[in-house]
């Protein structure tokens, strides 16, 4: 019988909920993350220069906030594992944030990134500073 492999997730600590890197595919250059968001918290703003985020809500109810550059307004896409769509593809060069709508349970997203995450490839702003950085 072959031996079982046991691996640890890389955990990226965040005050509004942790991120768990679960896989990096070197042959196709993709990464997969699990992103949990604590009740009534937001994460973002995030802007990827080249990567696409394929976000799947796998637990809870949440919404994705997207900045529309043309109108300078926030588009809100509600996600609920039981009622609404639970997948949103965020293309490169688009500011977005994640918001947990629950009062008492976390929201969990699976994020399949189209490339390798790098601090040089993405920009981040505090989620509560939207009006200060959108032009």
Task: List where the protein language model places each region.
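Asparagine-centered strand-capping/turn motif at beta-strand->loop junctions
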Residues: 98-101
């Amino acid at each position: 019988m072959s031996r079982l492999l046991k691996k640890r997730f890389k955990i990226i600590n965040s005050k509004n909920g942790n991120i768990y890197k679960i896989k990096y595919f070197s042959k196709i250059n993709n990464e997969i993350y699990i992103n949990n968001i604590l009740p009534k918290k937001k994460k973002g703003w995030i802007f990827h220069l080249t990567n696409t985020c394929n976000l799947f809500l796998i637990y809870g109810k949440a919404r994705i906030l997207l900045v529309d550059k043309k109108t300078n307004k926030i588009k809100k896409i509600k996600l609920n594992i039981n009622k609404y769509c639970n997948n949103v593809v965020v293309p490169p060069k688009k500011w977005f944030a994640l918001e947990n709508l629950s009062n008492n349970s976390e929201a969990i997203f699976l994020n399949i990134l189209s490339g390798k995450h790098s601090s040089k490839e993405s920009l981040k702003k505090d989620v509560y500073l939207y009006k200060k950085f959108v032009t």
